[in-house]
């Protein structure tokens, strides 16, 4: 089950980070419709948004997801083909591409087990 996988990712992350100093960096670039771990993929669905960083991995993931949700889509990809006349700012692009997944459940669970908090303050530099 995908939900169980998301829960395990949170649990493994907590185990790795427990009692260790940590800092997290996300590159919000070339956001593709499939996992970037796949050996094939489609064109990026949004413009490059930059780099985000935090000591809190949950806040970082939530901030990055919100930035993707609020970004317009770009053409020439799977998402643009299914929504050709929409910019989709404010729409959950992850859910539009994969309606059977619930990425938010992983963040809620990560917060529940004490990995971090979904609350964040976005500071642009």
Task: Locate each region found by the language model.
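Extended, low-polarity segments enriched in aliphatic/aromatic residues
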Residues: 3-125
């Amino acid at each position: 089950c995908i939900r169980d996988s998301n829960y395990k990712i949170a649990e493994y992350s907590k185990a790795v980070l427990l009692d260790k100093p940590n800092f997290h960096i996300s590159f919000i670039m070339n956001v593709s419709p499939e996992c970037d771990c796949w050996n094939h993929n489609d064109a990026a669905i949004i413009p490059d948004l930059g780099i985000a960083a935090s000591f809190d991995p949950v806040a970082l993931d939530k901030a990055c997801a919100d930035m993707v949700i609020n970004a317009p889509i770009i053409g020439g990809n799977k998402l643009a083909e299914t929504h050709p006349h929409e910019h989709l700012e404010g729409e959950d692009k992850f859910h539009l591409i994969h309606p059977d997944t619930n990425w938010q459940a992983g963040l809620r669970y990560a917060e529940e087990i004490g990995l971090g908090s979904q609350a964040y303050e976005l500071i642009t530099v």
